[in-house]
């Protein structure tokens, strides 16, 4: 993988690990991978590469806020890798994240480290298909930096209509 930005926030070993993990998680029902990142593009390239290799129809939706205007963007790194299965959204990260949860089968959270608990609750509330959530745990990044959780939508059984019993005596009708 060609990654144009010099800033790397995960090691090469973690890159390989994430690449294989995502490839293993993608199945025939996977349509979108949602990534909330940091605009450097390292993880975006990994996710898009794994998705393209496993199933060309899987798209990556990357929600990022660009704080670094001097370094190459994720889009430039994707282009260098001939990966075009990615769309970008920026601005209003919280809103964009919530709006896109329903589109994703796999969610990678590389931002919101302090808010993982509240983000998981949001995902549980909004997921409409079984969703695998991968997030970085910076405190444990020396070993295996990723945690994976599966969230299944809460399907409530439909309430049956109460039948109203007719207690009146039925009137016989004869056919002539």
Where are these regions (language model features)?
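S-adenosyl-L-methionine
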Residues: 1-4, 8-9
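S-adenosylmethionine/decaboxylated-SAM
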Residues: 3, 15-162, 166-168
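Positively charged N-terminal leader segments that act as targeting/secretion signals
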Residues: 169-174
């Amino acid at each position: 993988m060609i990654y144009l930005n010099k800033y790397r926030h995960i090691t090469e070993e973690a890159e390989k690990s994430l690449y294989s993990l995502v490839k293993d998680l993608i199945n025939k029902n996977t349509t979108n991978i949602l990534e909330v990142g940091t605009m450097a593009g390292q993880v975006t390239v990994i996710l898009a590469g794994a998705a393209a290799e496993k199933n060309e129809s899987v798209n990556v939706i990357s929600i990022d806020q660009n704080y670094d205007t001097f370094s190459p963007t994720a889009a430039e790194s994707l282009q260098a890798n001939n990966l075009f299965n990615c769309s970008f959204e920026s601005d209003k990260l919280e809103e964009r994240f919530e709006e896109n949860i329903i589109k994703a089968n796999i969610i990678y959270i590389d931002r919101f480290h302090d808010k993982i608990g509240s983000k998981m609750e949001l995902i549980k509330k909004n997921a409409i298909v079984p969703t695998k959530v991968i997030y970085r745990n910076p405190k444990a990044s020396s070993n295996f930096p990723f945690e994976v959780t599966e969230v299944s939508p809460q399907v409530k059984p439909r309430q049956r209509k109460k039948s109203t019993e007719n207690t009146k005596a039925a009137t016989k009708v004869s056919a002539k």
